[in-house]
């Protein structure tokens, strides 16, 4: 018998022997490396122990093939990699590939996990931005890569995109001017479960500038794609984002999310954005978020699944950011809110993570005290943690024993600069069920330093504290080993656990460090770990520790050491179903004394199918969840089957609104089936009117209890969600009203307030402010859907100073100008600023003058976001001069730019200030700035004195000013002057511009048609000046931005087919017979325009045909369909008009005459219809619609018996469909110029999509849609205007102003330091917008080198030895060629270049006159030879560059972005100091275009 004491001893020995492995006396293996700098871009090749990282300091790459124990420097076959490594980029979908991006265009690729590297060349700088990365990968084929780069010169950088389909064996350019590109198949999951053609694998989507180019002030971006790398069509195919139509916006970005592609679009004029989602890149749907708005930088796309997109939508705009978490249905269209008040930081990062490998488990942090945090940023957010086990449908607190646990997440680690490495997580790993985090128990999350390390081995259901204090942690051996290191500035040990974090042992590092990161292989199967930190003794020293737990010598686990673990449990503790299946894992038991030791081999989950339940269904297309989330209700009108619903009481079988979630694996037999059709009532069928009878409808006249009203629309942009058409109205009784349905119903806002003013935000059309008679200001940012208020820092000023000023970029930034010290006599105006929409204010300046203050930010202005420009009285006293002051810090410091100004103004990117020299105030000086800081004096023609001027609407390329010539009240007129591109040199564009006694002028710039303007001039100026005669007005039109003006061509017949009283010259206006219009100075409402921004080419006007403009009572109504070239009379008498549905309908109503009918046209004025809108006649004084003219609804504003009335008109019942985006409903229309052939405008051909007049559908374009920008045209007279000190002569040529000298063009060299040459004045200069090439180059005659640029000039224009033969032969050839050319092409007079086409008139000096032709031919040839020979000797002596340079053949251009004003395309024999036969450097200019 064995003694009992021996049995006890043996039992104790067995217990001791089974203790965790560390007790065996074995230690993990540790190897220490000292690095020059912390590793950058570190990553593991999946399925290996190979690690790659970059040393920022030495520009080297380092690789380890054994998990970090040994390292070597990557040198490449020729050693060129070392010292040139800028970036390391891993392939996200291929375990073998990685890329080293180097300097000078040389890069390397590995396809064998860094064992070897092959160089490739792309001669641009790798480019990363908020839009895209330098490399964009194809998820279907790892060999296909897009390379995003920048091509930089001294003039700046332009994006360049390349692609490869063979691992960079060959690299080809993709397309010019791409802002972002990606493969449609950017993820392996793309088009999952969809049968796609093979060509889809080559499809590339690119965001590119709008066809107007990237540098316009109305810059737009659009999305295009190609399946052939844009080889067949450089323009590609435009993606039809919105109901089968393309869309463009001020900002557009694309990205891939799981199997989806998401396009984010923002329109100009709103911060609201639209998300468009596609799962095949062909069909797109707008994502719907119910009443929530998606705003700029106000949403985050989170880690998503193959059947749903997760998005966090920001709901607060203070520093205390919060949001709401949404999940989409399977096609990404309709989103449902999962949880509110999620925690965000200012960078948009969200406390959100999905547990790795387990479907449906999510951990989020929300704000507990959200109400207090929303009120003030001073109330610190209190965060609490929640977990969902059912894909976000429900959430519950995390529990540690009985206490609630809260964990630090993404925002904390971002603030600590401790974000996880790529492929690594914050909480979880592929180790089944193991989750860890740093946090605390209690009411809410405390500071990170107060947190402890917690662990859960059941996927977050329950937690326990593992270690005290915050730790970095990592998993290994599929959870068999957990390592942790204290996250402090001084720690010298690593702790580890081999029983799921219950027991911990420690290993000494031998020195104290501050850990930077602790990692292992991304699949958590390895026993090798890497710890990187900085030395506590020397922070410049970086240490890397390789830790191998294979040194513990644990045995390999057998089947008895494993357990089956259920991923999710329901409330009953039973395995739960998600997407139709239960999920199970095999994992090591917590107390098993073994390691799995299967590196890179993860046993996947096992699934068990479930019967279908309600959770397996989602809302079908065009259905959305009800508010209680129990039903799917129609999102669009339902259409019953044919023959059904003859009576509202009928019923029919229709769709249930549900469908099985695609990819759901549930068993239908015996389960729920929500897809079955259900019985629906015909009384619930909604939609367009059942009767589409082709007639408009009118509402009953509504009486408003006010004598007068002021109103404006809050316009919806393309990216705005919803369908409301909102009008704000202020009455003479200080009442504020809003209508959200275009005037049918009205609601008074805050009846207890006295509103004195409405102010619409000039840059955001959904925003407006409403001032009371006190400090309170109400506002809306969502088209009047809701109203909020703030208290201004003072009462409004009463000095005609604009009370509010707005920021072009930041909607919440405002300047308020109120009164200060108004209790006594020293009442002054003071400016305040807020960046938080009035939540708090900072005082800026006292003594603000009439011009007020403005934000100086404009798109394209660098470092101008806080620039403010103010007019202020010197020393803050009103009796002193006004000065212009600027500041970049809200006037903590300021700079005085001008000490004695009249006024300042901002227009189209120019800052203009009028100032006096000394004490004289008879004439004004002007200075202009394009950056808001540096002002240059404006130079006016010397024959124009400037007593007063007005800044007019201008193109983005030039500044137009009206300079007063005669200030005699009703007899006032002035000169229209136009600047060069930087606003400093002005030339006279039009003389005698009509001005009224209030300083307004008859000048209209037409929106949509670039360069077209209409103006009225005083034709009898001498009589007005000398005899006091009444003004006689004529109407002029320009089609090239003021370069040329012409009289309007009258129609040949009136509307009744009768002749006019004067003799009409077909297609041309003459001094005796032309068409003249009443202009801007005669309008009651300056918002009324001749044109529509969305109805390209259409205009209406009131006027008469004759020698001059007659009285308004004699005016008739005229219309043009071709941008003002030809006109037709459409109605006798005076009418008011509005355009609707982008020109699909035009409505006319008699102007202030009793009437009860309107007239409308559906075919651009070719035929007209009459509609009676009321039973009795009303006097209508206004007709209105939304400013974009895209609505089918209108409002008539009138008077009935002294009372104000409004009548609504609705034309939506005329047609039932929108136009199809194809040739059946649209045609391509090109604007034309009356002086140019081939439809050339500004040197190129421009085509627009335009609705066919006969198409019975609604034009749904919100703005003119450009079809294409075609080739560049050759230059003609229409591409030039008169140069400085030159003016248009009576015959149309440009002549020197008497007594003046031409401007010395050498000044251009100092304005552009990179300029090599300049041209002597010819009297002409190119219009800034033109892109013409070659042809008639009126601004080029004699070329001169810029000072100190003689050598560069010689290189550009010199002749090389190889060109000797041509140089000798050329003078002789020139003599013959010039003579022959002069004979065959001579078409103008000696000494002048004429107005019109390149040709002149047929006269005795025309080319057909032998009197001219033969002498010219002979003289031209002799002179050419005589001048060439002596110059040839000098040229040969100093030439060193090629005769022909690199010019080559010119190519047509398909995008405006590649257009450039080509100067120097032709050279001539020049003066002695110049080169002979200079060859222009065409290619150099093209590179800079």
UniProtKB/Swiss-Prot annotation:
InterPro entries: Sortilin_C, Sortilin_N, VPS10, VPS10-sortilin, WD40/YVTN_repeat-like_dom_sf. Pfam families: Sortilin-Vps10, Sortilin_C. This is Vacuolar protein sorting/targeting protein 10. Belongs to the VPS10-related sortilin family. SMART domains: VPS10. Coiled coil: none annotated. Keywords: Glycoprotein, Golgi apparatus, Membrane, Protein transport, Receptor, Repeat, Signal, Transmembrane, Transmembrane helix, Transport. Glycans are attached at residues 306, 331, 684, 862, 925, 982, 1272. It is found in: Golgi apparatus, trans-Golgi network membrane; Prevacuolar compartment membrane. GO terms for cellular component: cytosol; Golgi apparatus; membrane. It comes from the Eukaryota. Functions as a sorting receptor in the Golgi compartment required for the intracellular sorting and delivery of soluble vacuolar proteins, like carboxypeptidase Y (CPY) and proteinase A. Executes multiple rounds of sorting by cycling between the late Golgi and a prevacuolar endosome-like compartment. It is a multi-pass membrane protein. BNR repeats lie at residues 63-72, 387-396, 454-464, 495-505, 738-747, 1118-1128, 1160-1169. It comes from Penicillium rubens (strain ATCC 28089 / DSM 1075 / NRRL 1951 / Wisconsin 54-1255) (Penicillium chrysogenum). The chain crosses the membrane at residues 1363-1383, 1411-1431.
